[in-house]
Design a protein with these regions (language model features):
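Glycine-rich phosphate/diphosphate-binding loop of Rossmann-like nucleotide-binding domains
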Residues: 191-194, 199-311
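Conserved active-site and cofactor/substrate-binding residues in soluble primary-metabolism enzymes
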Residues: 1, 15-22, 26, 41, ...
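Flexible, glycine/charged-enriched surface loops at secondary-structure junctions
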Residues: 21, 37-44, 117, 154-163, ...
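Glycine/serine-rich phosphate-binding loop and adjoining beta1-alpha1 elements at the start
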Residues: 94, 113-227
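Structured beta-strand/loop patches that form or line metal/cofactor-binding pockets in enzymes
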Residues: 40-71
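Rossmann-like adenosine-cofactor binding region
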Residues: 262-363, 368
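Adenosine-phosphate binding glycine-rich loop
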Residues: 2-23, 218, 333-445
Length: 445
């Protein structure tokens, strides 16, 4: 496999799409040896087929604000690869949304979904609409206008969107209500639904819970556990909240959360009422964490910085892509970090990942660590198809088993001759091989 040539061709076809190209190159570097051991992959041109989406759908979304002013946003749905099941991936509403970010997320989703062992292909979508600062009525009108364009493209056996940044329970509700009106059917076409109307228990916290389960499995390979460890977590949304909750439950002390304005350092640990307050912070719609220190004066707010300068044993970045750079990685290593588990999608830059690998610490990528969210979405799809619901305890138990299985796949495919586990390589190989063989079985279609 000539990775340099493949990347040159992709850069020519997709100029300026840095996030997408970064994600593709990481996967290609990981799977190179396995790919070359299977000439049937090359004969079927699997690489060129898998790095290009099946289709990209772009549409305008017209909506009216509370003052009667008409706005126009861009909407997207990328159906990347459906070899192992219906396209599956979230919708992101954020001003930063563009094709490069959605293609990177959709590409990662292929392998993440493959790792769960559930029958789900990879997709992603969203809009540059910003729900922050909007009234409920404005968000509802936007969601209805968005679904007016999207509904013909999706279906429970075709493409099943979910939430992501900017798309929580409120937005999923408005989207589903409009879909139901247009399609005149009550089906599992979206996941992340309310528990009263087809949703799964445990969905909001599933990504964070799964990330912590994965970190625990990583530490177990060294005869260690999260009990008694100090943990730095970035972000303060659903993923961070779930991670803080589960890490605390397993005996760790979480000392940081963060937002766009800076980070909170709480030496006493974020637990109990402090975890509940995280939900109030998010519900305030202000996207800041500084008010935490007003509620809990013993905590410290560090403006404009990320939490990776704090001395901790474990780091779980749960905010956004490329939030952890080389300097951040070096700070963590200098302060004795032993495990980094990516709760967000691609939060570490290539330079940061190289630093962790060179130091031979435990490091695992988002496509494995945060797969608990989409795994629980898959469990929601299963419940919808059966017209049946599991308890929170049943869903949590199934999630734990799935995360343990994903970890095992990474270990089996990523362990080198010295016994070091390259979780990036292991996750990429395990996810890729399943999809590649499925594509071979189905021919060129």
């Amino acid at each position: 496999m000539n990775i340099e040539k493949i990347m040159q061709d992709l850069e020519r076809k997709h100029p300026g799409e840095a996030e997408y190209l970064q994600a593709v190159e990481e996967v290609l570097e990981s799977i190179k040896d396995v790919y070359e051991e299977h000439p049937e992959f090359e004969a079927a041109n699997i690489i060129e087929r898998i790095v290009e989406p099946d289709r990209i759908l772009t549409f305008k979304v017209q909506w009216v604000d509370d003052n009667g002013k008409v706005h126009v946003n861009l909407g997207y749905r990328i159906q990347f690869n459906g070899a192992i099941g219906p396209y599956k991936g979230g919708l992101r509403f954020h001003p930063s949304v563009n094709l490069s970010i959605l293609k990177f997320l959709g590409f990662e989703q292929i392998f993440k979904n493959s790792l769960t062992t559930l029958p789900m292909g990879g997709g992603k979508g969203g809009s540059d609409f910003n729900p922050k600062g909007k009234s409920d009525a404005e968000v509802m009108r936007f969601c209805q206008a968005f679904m007016l364009e999207l509904w013909r493209l999706i279906g429970p056996q075709t493409d099943v969107p979910a939430g992501d940044i900017g798309v929580g329970g409120r937005e999923i509700g408005y989207l589903y209500g409009m879909y139901k009106k247009l399609a005149r059917e009550h089906t599992g076409v979206l996941t992340g639904k309310g528990a009263n109307w087809g949703g799964s228990k445990m969905r909001p916290e599933a990504t964070g819970f799964g990330a912590v389960y994965f970190a625990q499995e990583m530490l177990n390979t060294k005869g260690d556990s999260l009990k008694g460890k100090t943990v730095a977590i970035s972000g303060f949304g659903n993923v961070a909240w779930g991670a803080v909750t589960k890490a605390t439950e397993l005996g760790a002390k979480v000392v940081t959360i963060s937002g766009p304005d800076g980070y909170i350092y709480d030496a006493d640990g974020i637990s109990g009422d402090k975890i509940k307050y995280m939900l109030e912070l998010r519900a305030s719609n202000n996207d800041v964490v500084k008010p935490y220190t007003f509620e809990f004066p013993g905590a410290k707010f560090v403006e404009g910085k990320r939490p990776w300068e704090v001395k901790v044993d474990v780091a779980i970045p749960c905010a956004t892509q490329n939030e952890m750079g080389k300097e951040d990685a070096e700070n963590l290593l200098k302060n004795g970090v032993i495990c980094v588990a990516e709760g967000a999608n691609m939060p570490s830059t290539p330079e940061a990942i190289a630093a962790f690998h060179n130091a031979k610490i435990l490091f695992a990528p988002g496509k494995a660590v945060n797969a608990g969210g989409v795994a629980t979405s898959g469990l929601e799809m299963s419940q919808n198809s059966m017209k049946y619901g599991w308890s929170a305890e049943e869903v949590d138990a199934k999630l734990h088993v799935i995360m343990r299985d994903i970890h095992q796949q990474c270990v089996e495919n990523g362990t080198d001759e010295t016994g070091y586990v390259d979780y990036v390589k292991g996750a990429n190989i395990a996810g890729f091989v399943k999809v590649a063989y499925s594509m071979l079985d189905q021919g060129v279609a």
